[in-house]
A protein has these predicted regions:
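Short, acidic/polar
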Residues: 328-342, 439-451, 566
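Aromatic- and carboxylate-enriched substrate-binding clefts and catalytic-loop regions
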Residues: 344-555
């Protein structure tokens, strides 16, 4: 990391109470201040506006124009974004991110508001800079602040806007940008998308519907040659937003996308008062967003959020009884278990329908007339069939009219007006994860399900589980309403640790049903899932995302294959290293089950995929997410390394042409289409790459085995 000091000083001396010293302001015509890490540079002008540059090869690329990158908005709507640069200092620091350098820049606005900007650079994170801002009101009048904004940057559409000709810009067929945005929405939209002119999305990390919210506090925009990302690194979830926009009204050769982080909260800054923002980052990368998520995961691990250990059973394939839906019978499930075992499945999941209601969690007396004894016997039947038993559960929800509401209304999470908060799917209400009574009630349920009934895993399900709104229940005595928001991850930690105390090999799957996973919850589960994907594309993009956030060998479950394209796209899960699963049914009188019947034709296909899965076990390999760009590279490509081989997965409606094989270290590789059992010959490597001529529809799965100097495996 290096720093370019200012060389010329103006003659006027200005007193800066924030630093308790008198500081000399900088000549506004002087060179900009440059704060660098090895791969990224922030340049600040005399008004403390900034722009980002990247050095990820032999040249520096300026990514956009100067912006008012850190500023305040007053209650009246005034932007305070011009701060005359007064001084800058630099010193070495040591933190949980390692040894690094901190540059402090100080500026003052015309109304007397002072800005102290700290920029930290660590060799451990060479393409990233970390930022914190403190504002101090040194004027004699109070300021009412409604919002702070940070990391407001521009990414130009063209690699060099000054030399982009109009014809090139007009004839470009691919999108200018792709983007990853970590917010959650009720329509369960894609987390990764191309940006079209006119695009805008607020990406609020709170609730974007009554029961959809939270997410991963990162936004990333990339063009074909370079990407730009921002995020916050607080150990608690915060109600910030990450707006991403791509205006439609800019000249075609000056097109640019924008992103920033903001927090809307009214704060009165009396004379002498200070306001400090969150710790945030700005990062640059090549190819897609995977490098950003990997960096973010590593940063948060150094700060204390470490992903859970994973038992081998978390990689085993799954059969789920949800094909029979809520009106299942035990005869239906029990007659299906032998077929599940025959196909190579290792888990059987009892889904929704075993309980009388959400909240009470009493056993349905029609299905369990003998109560706990019947449930224990059912679990033993699953184990006798050679399968492990997992149970569905939707905590933090309580149905109207239940004993819990009648006996414990104080457990409810309440809105500001005192009303209950709806969980729409189950027509229920939110419970508050910060309330100790809710926490202990959940602990007792986990002890019953895993300890008394004998289940070896939990499928914790519901879009309401990803985030919760602020709680205004006076019975809870919260320090702030946001206490519920920040307590959710700790609630999951309690559930996870309780489960591990009972069974250290228990599989804890949390399925937030269409939400973008809240990163702060991830350390407290050991299996994620594509959570009701709308398309096979979502299966793949969610897999790439969660491998980035949890680890290259994290057990990500592709969900029931029946939710994929054509209800049979095993390849989208298999090729990215996802756990396979199904909810097939056997003949019965259950109408809901008819669409999932395992007929003889399907059985052959299901058997082939599960046999191949158990043979290869790709989720235990290493997902190489930085080799290909999920947006710009065509065909879409994913790679898993395992046991010395490389497994490439290509996806397209149809493709004929040459495939570029990246990440190769040997001189030659034997290539096999391992799904169809076809020998595709030998490829020779040049500069870590090789090419393979291919013709396929939907998918192509190939294994590359390195050959020795004599051509042997």
């Amino acid at each position: 990391m290096s720093f370019k000091f200012i060389s010329r000083l103006a003659a006027i001396i200005v007193c800066v109470p924030l630093l308790h010293a008198c500081i000399t302001p900088v000549d506004q015509e002087d060179e900009v201040v440059k704060v660098k890490n090895s791969g990224i540079t922030l340049e600040f002008d005399g008004q403390l506006h900034s722009r980002v540059s990247a050095t990820l090869g032999n040249e520096m690329k300026v990514l956009g124009d100067y912006q008012g990158s850190e500023y305040l908005v007053t209650k009246s709507g005034e932007l305070i974004d011009d701060f005359m640069l007064l001084n800058s200092t630099q010193h070495q620091i040591d933190s949980n991110l390692g040894s690094g350098m901190q540059t402090t820049l100080v500026g003052v606005a015309s109304n007397g508001l002072q800005k102290q900007l700290q920029v930290q650079a660590f060799p451990n994170f060479p393409n990233t800079l970390f930022i914190r801002v403190t504002y101090k009101n040194t004027a004699s009048q109070s300021l009412i602040i409604s919002k702070w904004v940070q990391n407001a940057y521009q990414l130009s559409a063209a690699e060099n806007t000054q030399h982009t000709d109009l014809m090139t810009a007009m004839t470009r067929s691919e999108p200018d940008f792709w983007s990853y945005q970590g917010a959650s929405f009720a329509d369960r939209r894609d987390w990764v998308m191309p940006l079209q002119p006119g695009y805008e999305q607020q990406n609020y990390m709170g609730m974007n519907a009554t029961d959809y919210g939270s997410g991963t506090a990162v936004a990333d925009i990339w063009r074909k040659d370079i990407g730009l990302a921002i995020g916050h690194i607080d150990l608690d979830p915060k109600l910030v937003s990450f707006p991403v926009t791509y205006p439609a009204n800019e000249h075609i050769t000056e097109k640019a996308a924008y992103l920033h982080v903001e927090l809307e909260k009214t704060v009165k800054l009396a004379p002498g008062d200070e306001l400090t923002t969150l710790d945030t980052f700005v990062s640059v990368h090549q190819k897609d967003y995977y490098a950003t998520l990997k960096m973010y995961r590593n940063v948060m691990a150094k700060k204390g959020l470490v992903m859970a250990d994973v038992p081998d059973s978390a990689y085993e394939p799954i059969w789920c009884a949800w094909g029979y839906e809520r009106d299942f019978s035990f005869d239906e499930i029990l007659q299906t278990l032998p077929k599940a075992k025959e196909l190579g499945l290792e888990w059987a999941v009892l889904d929704d329908g075993w309980q009388t209601a959400e909240g009470d969690w009493y056993l349905d007396p029609e299905k369990f007339p003998n109560g706990d004894a019947d449930m224990q016997a059912f679990v033993e039947d699953i184990k006798s069939a050679g399968l492990k038993a997992k149970l569905w559960w939707a905590p933090l929800a309580v149905d109207p009219g239940t004993d819990m509401i009648e006996q414990h209304p104080e457990m409810l999470l309440l809105n500001k007006d005192g009303s209950t908060r709806d969980v729409t799917w189950w027509d229920s209400y939110y419970l508050c994860p910060a309330d100790e009574r809710v926490r202990q009630h959940s602990v007792e349920l986990v002890k019953k399900m895993l300890g008394e009934w004998g289940y070896e895993g939990l499928k914790i399900d519901g879009h309401h589980l990803n985030g919760v709104p602020p709680c205004y229940n006076p019975e809870h005595n919260h320090a702030t309403p946001e206490a519920s928001v920040e307590a959710l991850a700790d609630y999951w930690k309690l559930i996870y640790e309780t489960a591990m105390e009972i069974n250290p090999d228990a599989v804890i799957e949390i399925c937030p049903c269409g939400d973008s996973y809240a990163f702060h919850n991830l350390p407290y589960m050991n299996q994620t899932v594509s959570s009701d994907p709308l398309t096979s594309w979502q299966v793949r993009l969610k897999g790439k995302t969660l491998k980035g956030l949890m680890g290259e060998s994290a057990p990500y479950y592709g969900d029931h294959v029946e939710l994929s394209d054509n209800a049979s796209d095993f390849a989208s899960s298999f090729g990215i290293g996802a756990v396979l699963g199904t909810k097939f049914t056997m003949p019965s009188d259950n109408e809901a089950a008819q669409q999932f019947l395992l007929n003889p034709e399907k059985e052959v296909i299901w058997k082939q995929w599960f046999d191949l899965y158990n043979q290869k076990m790709l989720p235990k390999g290493t997902y190489l997410g930085e080799l290909y760009d999920i947006g710009f590279d065509r065909p879409e490509t994913h790679v898993v390394a395992k046991d010395g081989s490389l497994y490439f997965a290509f996806y397209a409606d149809s493709y004929t042409g040459s495939l570029e094989l990246r990440g190769l270290t040997a001189q030659q590789y034997k290539v096999t289409d391992y799904f169809h059992g076809k020998d595709l010959g030998v490829v020779t490597v040049t500069d870590g790459k090789a090419n393979l001529t291919a013709n396929f529809n939907q998918f192509l799965l190939v294994e590359l085995i390195p050959l020795g100097a004599n051509g042997s495996e």
